[in-house]
Amino acid sequence: MKKTILTAVAVGLIVGFTAPAANTAPAANNERGTINWHDCDAANQEAGATLEGYECGTLTVPLDWDNLANPANAQIAVVIHRTTSPKRIGALTFNPGGPGISGISRAKEYATLIPTKIFTAFDFVAWDPRGVGLSQPQLVNCPAPSAPFPPATGPVDWENYVTQTYDIVSAANKPCLDNNKDLAPYLGTYYVIRDLEAMRVALNFKKWNFMGDSYGSRVGYWYAREYPKSLRTLVLDGSYSPTLTATSWLAEQSYSYSSAQTVFTSLPGTSTPWKLQRIFDALNEREVLVNGITSSRWAVAAEFFSLVPYQLYYQQIVEHINIVYDALFNPNKPTVPPSAPIDNEETTANELSILHVVNCRDLTDYPTIKEIAAAAEAASFTSMGTALQIVQDGVNCAGFPDDFFHGYLPATGQLRLKNSPVVVHSIGDPL
């Protein structure tokens, strides 16, 4: 979670005024287009805290927005904190990224970090995209792929490693698709933005404000293209390129992570980039023992570089660099524990399956093994962490048929919104 978006929210949202107005709900099939309000027990559990002052409900929408005759529905979990301020501006919602991350699980986090002046001026809406968190239905019986790191030391045959990883992920993706034939085709941003529009109508908002982080920028961008009159303001952080394909993502990730690494190493002082380079030069030839745990260059890279874009964690990353450096070059020096552990969130099996299905539903032009290997090898000369990330992203669609794509072709032209969108950290930020 980056605090940068919250500054942008303050800039982007205090623009104009939006008062609530009535809307006519779309034609409903049974309860389609309506919200069933109920207790917040499940939402509190999902959020990991009591959502005081929130109303909790479930929005019913068609599973297949392209065929409303299909009787199957999806249930979208939604919570709302209604402002009582006489200076109410409108409604604010968000998507925290992923794909596969629950908005309800991040409701308290976002609400706490948003400046009070902003939060109290809006009805605040959090929701779980279809297939995520409390929303139903969900993917079932999807194996979790577990790919090994490349060789601990020495040169890497990137094509061989990518082939191995591709086969492992393919062996998980194929049964996931087979076990979810009635759901997987209806997961993707194409459907999410239609659910989002149905939610706006059901909540009786003439317009609302959207902030999207990481993958949430894809949701916000395509929602703005499809429903420009439904948005008052749009704030995108760590934004994906609207021209993104599954293959061009490899180059974008390489550039973004390398840029983020450059920013990080330029700030903590001259000794940090020198230490970092010396660490990885040494780890190319041997592993390191830290606090009784043996780690390879890949484990160290994964720990450090996954959080490079987060300036909030710079101090902890510097501390961990010093610990690894001393373990390698000053083994007799007493180990000083970091002031706080690096918080690398684990990705659940469901989140990983959703990530693969949604990205491969959204993005065309799946990369080949040779393309992934070439991109990873090129990145490895400057950043091992970037190389690992490229392989991870590149094999997303292993095992998916080429015609699984059902989203939007790379965009051309500009968004046409009354208020210009605020886009932050679109370069040098992989998140």
Predicted regions and their residues:
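Catalytic-loop region of hydrolases
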Residues: 2-7, 21-163, 276-279, 405
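Alpha/beta-hydrolase fold active-site neighborhood
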Residues: 272-418
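Short beta-strand/loop motif that positions the catalytic acidic residue
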Residues: 417, 423-425
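A catalytic-pocket lid/entrance helix-loop region that shapes and gates access to the active site
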Residues: 140-151, 220-275, 322-332, 339
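Acidic catalytic loop of the alpha/beta-hydrolase fold
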Residues: 311, 428-431
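Conserved acidic catalytic loop of the alpha/beta-hydrolase fold
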Residues: 175, 179-182, 193-207
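Glycine-rich nucleophile elbow surrounding the catalytic serine of serine-hydrolase chemistry
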Residues: 102, 194, 212-224
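Bacterial N-terminal signal peptides
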Residues: 8-16
